[in-house]
């Protein structure tokens, strides 16, 4: 979510601030569910400076008990390619994810991305994915296209590669996830319906079967 906001703000010629408040029927992360949390509420804020630096924070909460699911923070830098049209560029960032109170799953990722017309291609490296011993590399392509003033379509494909496992542990297999959806702008609101899931490879065996299934996601958000 924070990286997606950076694509929009990175074209700013002056300092810009953007905040977003939204809700979703279910929380999904890289093609999988994150637990039996039900509907969730998200708030985020981003600041982009003319020199190319940007930063953002976001939080995700359960609706049934207002408990924090996770919090994220990102600091990055974006730029343009002088020889290419202005809608081409690049960005790099550090991203930190915090889960609930104990912090056992907290992890940091480094990101490098290529930005183009209606798409962003990014690679993410985590030395301790979800606080564990495995390092991972995640490559994702996100794209969107406006059909008219109201309707837009969007899609995503991501590939997660695990490094060597800890001693005497089997290596987690790679996997590929996809997402496709359609959105509508209704006044100040953006309403989206999407379907995501794992299309190749397998999730870790310790995850609940429900989290490994594909799912529909209905969401709505407003920017301010």
Model-derived regions: residue spans:
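Membrane-embedded beta-strands of outer-membrane beta-barrel proteins
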Residues: 43-45, 73-75, 92, 110-112, ...
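Transmembrane beta-strands of outer-membrane beta-barrel pores
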Residues: 23-29, 59-63, 79, 94-100, ...
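Cleavable N-terminal export/targeting peptides
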Residues: 1-18, 224
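Outer-membrane beta-barrel "beta-signal"
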Residues: 117, 180-190, 210-224
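Short glycine/proline- and aromatic-enriched beta-strand/turn motifs that initiate or cap beta-hairpins
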Residues: 14-63
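Detector for outer-membrane/organellar transmembrane beta-barrel domains
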Residues: 105-166
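Repeated loop/turn-to-beta-strand initiation elements of outer-membrane beta-barrel proteins
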Residues: 17-19, 51-55, 82-92, 118-123, ...
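Solvent-exposed loop/turn segments connecting transmembrane beta-strands
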Residues: 30-39, 61-71, 97-107, 127-137, ...
């Amino acid at each position: 979510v924070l990286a997606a906001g950076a694509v929009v703000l990175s074209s700013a010629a002056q300092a810009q601030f953007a905040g977003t408040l939204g809700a979703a029927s279910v929380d999904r992360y890289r093609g999988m569910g994150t637990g039996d949390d039900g509907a969730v509420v998200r708030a985020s804020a981003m600041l982009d400076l003319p020199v190319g630096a940007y930063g953002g924070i976001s939080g995700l909460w359960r609706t049934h008990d207002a408990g924090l699911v996770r919090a994220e923070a990102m600091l990055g830098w974006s730029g343009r390619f002088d020889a290419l049209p202005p809608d081409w560029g690049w960005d790099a960032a550090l991203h930190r994810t915090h889960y609930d109170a104990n912090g056992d799953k907290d992890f940091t990722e480094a990101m490098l991305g290529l930005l183009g017309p209606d798409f962003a291609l990014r690679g993410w490296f985590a030395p301790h994915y979800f606080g564990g011993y495995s390092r991972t590399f995640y490559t994702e392509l996100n794209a969107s296209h406006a059909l008219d003033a109201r309707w837009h379509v969007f899609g995503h494909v991501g590939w997660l590669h695990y490094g060597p496992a800890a001693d005497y542990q089997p290596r987690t297999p790679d996997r590929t996830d996809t997402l496709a959806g359609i959105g509508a702008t209704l006044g100040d609101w953006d309403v989206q319906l999407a379907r995501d899931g794992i299309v190749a490879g397998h999730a870790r065996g310790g995850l609940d079967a429900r989290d490994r299934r594909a799912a529909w996601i209905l969401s709505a958000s407003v920017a301010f």
